[in-house]
């Protein structure tokens, strides 16, 4: 991004993309007004459809518009909106964005279990709230596109975070390297597990920057020349004790944490703002990262979760999810499959030096 005029134009584009798409109840009253709403939505999101496809997509959009409208009339602590997924069925959405084969694998033998310890076990007190964004340990929201690479984005958030904590430098790292090169256990756009990705980064001696190995949103051939220029290394990873939100709280108080959740519900698909308390199960199908926690004025506890569906989704790319519920697994299974990277020092590989373009 260049300075002055180009910077201003880029900022205007970002604001346009993240601007909320609103509609009035009257736009739902007739088929004609609904068509007008659909065309306005398509223009807002620059979605092109063939004539045949438009009719099919309009019917889906109409159903979703009614769902969003009816849900927002209810007394819930969160709201929905017609986002970029509004003409996708929930089944299509799940298959494309949350069907990434992140499964609860620790019940099976052979999974990467870290070093078998939990370094934060003896932590007695934690702050009332934590926001790693405000501490400068979180990069801007990214977009995985139509590729089931959420596991890579979840992994990278946690590694970027612990690297900033140890070095005081925030460096955007490469999800595409994981997609292309971490293929022994993980499956690129067809899904993967964060624990395997942490192990890959450790074994390879680090991971390169996003600038050196940019994201493409498809499975490519591993570029060995780029892979052999690691910028940030880790010393391993640990798993948070399963089904224990108190243990998860201790971990998040000290660094961003990778988690898996069930993100396939309609309310999650169209989440806009507020503390999400919606219906969801524990069929873990999406990798995200917790970058903080807090409590609302009315006393509702929440996790601050960074997603990888772009800044237009949710609260500028984030979702606040209810924390401390009665189910031990946590809302949407958030406490079932949490892990974080270990970095013992500020030392990093010398294969490539971070540039001003890399550091944020």
Curated annotation (Swiss-Prot):
The pro-endopeptidase goes directly from the ER lumen to the ricinosome, and the secretory pathway via the Golgi apparatus is not involved in the ricinosome biogenesis. It holds the Pfam family Peptidase_C1. Belongs to the peptidase C1 family. GO terms for molecular function: cysteine-type peptidase activity. The keyword Ribonucleoprotein does not apply. This is Vignain. Keywords: Cytoplasmic vesicle, Disulfide bond, Glycoprotein, Hydrolase, Protease, Signal, Thiol protease. It comes from Ricinus communis (Castor bean). Residues 341-360 are annotated as: Disordered. InterPro entries: Papain-like_cys_pep_sf, Pept_asp_AS, Pept_cys_AS, Pept_his_AS, Peptidase_C1A, Peptidase_C1A_C, Peptidase_C1A_papain-like, Prot_inhib_I29. GO terms for cellular component: cytoplasmic vesicle.
């Amino acid at each position: 991004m260049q300075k002055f005029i180009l910077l201003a134009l880029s900022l205007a584009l970002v604001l346009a993309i993240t601007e909320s798409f609103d509609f009035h109840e009257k736009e739902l009253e007739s088929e004609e007004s609904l068509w007008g709403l659909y065309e306005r939505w398509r223009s807002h999101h620059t979605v092109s459809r063939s004539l045949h496809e438009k009719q099919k997509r309009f019917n889906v959009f109409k159903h979703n518009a009614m769902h969003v409208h009816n849900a927002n009339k209810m007394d819930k602590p969160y709201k929905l909106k017609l986002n970029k997924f509004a003409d996708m069925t929930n089944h299509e959405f799940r298959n494309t964005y949350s069907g990434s084969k992140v499964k609860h694998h620790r019940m099976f033998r052979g999974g990467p279990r870290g070093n078998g310890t939990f370094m934060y076990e003896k932590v007695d007190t934690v702050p009332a709230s934590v926001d790693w964004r405000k501490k400068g340990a979180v990069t801007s929201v990214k977009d995985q596109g139509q590729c089931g690479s959420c596991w890579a984005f979840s992994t990278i958030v946690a590694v970027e975070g612990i690297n900033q904590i140890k070095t005081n430098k925030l460096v955007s790292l490469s999800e595409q390297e994981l997609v292309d090169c971490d293929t022994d256990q993980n499956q690129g756009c067809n899904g993967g597990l964060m624990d395997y990705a942490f192990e890959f980064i450790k074994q390879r001696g680090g991971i390169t920057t996003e600038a050196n190995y940019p994201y493409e949103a498809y499975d490519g051939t591993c570029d060995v020349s780029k892979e052999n220029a690691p910028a940030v290394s880790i010393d391993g990873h640990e798993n948070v004790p399963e089904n224990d939100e108190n243990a998860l709280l201790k971990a998040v108080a000290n660094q961003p944490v990778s988690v898996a959740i069930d993100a396939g519900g309609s309310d999650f698909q169209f989440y806009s703002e507020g503390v999400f308390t919606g219906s969801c199960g524990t069929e873990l199908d999406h990798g995200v990262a917790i970058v903080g926690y807090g409590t609302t004025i009315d006393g509702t506890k929440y996790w601050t979760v960074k997603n990888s569906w772009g800044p237009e989704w949710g609260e500028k790319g984030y979702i606040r999810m209810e924390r401390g519920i009665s189910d031990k697994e946590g809302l949407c299974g958030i406490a079932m499959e949490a892990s974080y990277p270990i970095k013992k020092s500020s030392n990093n590989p010398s294969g490539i030096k971070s540039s001003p373009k890399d550091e944020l």
